UniProtKB/Swiss-Prot annotation:
<dbReference type="InterPro" id="IPR053222">
    <property type="entry name" value="Zygotic_Embryogenesis-Asso"/>
</dbReference>
<protein>
    <recommendedName>
        <fullName>F-box associated domain-containing protein sdz-33</fullName>
    </recommendedName>
</protein>
<dbReference type="InterPro" id="IPR001810">
    <property type="entry name" value="F-box_dom"/>
</dbReference>
<dbReference type="Pfam" id="PF00646">
    <property type="entry name" value="F-box"/>
</dbReference>
<comment type="function">
    <text>Substrate recognition component of E3 ubiquitin-protein ligase complex which mediates the ubiquitination and subsequent proteasomal degradation of target proteins such as mdl-1. Positively regulates axon regeneration by targeting mdl-1 for ubiquitin-mediated degradation; probably thereby reducing levels of mdl-1-mxl-1 heterodimers, allowing free mxl-1 to form complexes with tdpt-1 and thus inhibiting tdpt-1-dependent sumoylation of ets-4.</text>
</comment>
<dbReference type="InterPro" id="IPR012885">
    <property type="entry name" value="F-box-assoc_dom_typ2"/>
</dbReference>
<feature type="domain" description="F-box">
    <location>
        <begin position="5"/>
        <end position="51"/>
    </location>
</feature>
<dbReference type="Pfam" id="PF07735">
    <property type="entry name" value="FBA_2"/>
</dbReference>
Length: 300
């Protein structure tokens, strides 16, 4: 009688499902390359994330975060001549295994991991290098919902053509375009230079800014413009300052010519309420001690 190389393949599906639930990510990835049946069974397990993060750095890597594990990393060892790739799976403890499938490229591995761990194929890209078109060729069949641009050489406006499903965008070094600002993103995080006009024309729901010194007068103009109807989709506007890099916000300057009510006053934060003529209200909060942030949240 011939020996079965992988006895687990002979188990009935209901027994196999129970066994799979007792296993971890490493075991699942090892088993998923043995047969299509096991691959599909693992993909239906509950608890895996709906989205995973794919980082393009000097070496290609992929990070998965979900309920069944806090953090799981992958690296690709690429054969430059054939473009075949081995997958190294890392755990939080720093241990890893290497998986090899003949003919598998980086694209094949990404699609495989996405199917097994994230069935809807929604991904987050972190771009450290300017080769965005090369990245697109690898992930074009997936639904890219979030992109973080670390490279200063990527034109942010190019992203909208490549990734029409984009909802979350982080721009850390690249210049930001008016096309991006006026696009209906759910969340825009900016660490590059922005102006008052950039803020006023933005059409995102959640706008987060770091590393910019937005003055009290500019914030006053922004709030007065919001009261008059600007930024209609805005739900949250957030500025994070480095500690003690500027003078404290002045209440008299911030709310000049604005009707407002102070709702809370603490050592580390103060909260005020402003409103539009139609009754829409917003909470304005900042840190009076360290001056580390300014936050405006529209009430719904």
């Amino acid at each position: 009688m011939a020996t079965v190389p992988f006895p687990i393949l002979c188990l009935p599906d209901f027994v196999l499902q129970k066994s799979l639930k007792l296993m971890g990510v490493v075991e699942h990835l090892c088993l998923s390359i043995l047969s299509k049946n096991i691959k599909q069974l693992i993909a239906t397990l509950k608890g895996y994330p709906k989205c995973f993060s794919f980082k393009f750095v000097p070496f290609t890597s992929l990070t998965v975060v979900g309920e069944r594990f806090k953090h799981f990393s992958f690296r690709f060892d690429i054969d430059e001549s054939s473009q075949n790739a081995n997958l190294r799976s890392y755990t939080d403890e720093g241990t890893y295994i290497t998986l090899t499938v003949p003919g598998f490229t980086v694209k094949h591995w990404i699609e495989h991991v996405a199917y097994v761990l994230c069935r809807n194929n929604s991904i987050k890209l972190v771009l450290w290098e300017p080769n965005i078109d090369e990245v697109y060729e690898i992930v074009k069949d997936m639904r890219t919902v979030e992109v973080v641009i670390v490279s200063s050489e990527i034109q942010s406006c190019h992203l909208l053509k490549l990734f029409p499903s984009l909802r979350y965008l982080g721009v850390y070094k690249a210049p930001i375009s008016a096309q991006i600002l006026t696009y209906n993103l759910l969340h825009l995080e900016v660490k590059t230079k922005v102006t008052l006009n950039d803020i006023l024309i933005s059409n995102c729901s959640n706008f987060s800014i770091s590393g910019n010194d937005v003055s009290d007068k500019e914030l006053n103009f922004f709030m007065r413009s919001w009261i008059k109807g600007s930024n209609p989709r805005l739900t949250k506007f957030y500025i994070r300052n480095s500690l003690r890099v500027r003078d404290p916000y002045l209440e008299t300057v911030l709310f000049q010519n604005i009707d407002y009510i102070e709702t809370h006053k603490k050592i580390y934060w103060r909260t005020f309420e402003i409103s539009r003529p139609d009754g829409t209200k917003a909470d304005v909060m900042w840190d009076p001690l360290y001056n580390s942030y300014f936050n405006m949240t529209v009430q719904h």
